[in-house]
């Protein structure tokens, strides 16, 4: 089973983002993630046979906000900024593989051969900002793939202090 820990944006942040995307007009050239899949990954564990032991409950709750956008090859994302996020991600295992942690919310995917598709959208969304919110819990999520695409479901919840 493929597992990762994440923070889920609250409904008012989801609504603000949905409104912004509706205002911008969604580009069919991109494969947009449904709002039900929006999350901020903390730690990625990959295909593991059992649920890992995680010491996340009771950790300080980070204060977050969306500000700006960017791309990885084939991925359009929104930047997640805030106090306490890097520390929580580190506790969840981010960076254990030697890669630098980059807090983000994946919005869409596109053909890596067409980097301009993502770059244009990143520029359009660069000024998008949300009000800050406090993440009251981290979640362990399972990723499942079928003919309809990828879906995520919460396996465990870790309440945060704050």
Residue spans for each PLM region:
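Histidine-dependent nucleotide/RNA phosphoesterase domain, centered on the 2H-phosphoesterase fold
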Residues: 1-162
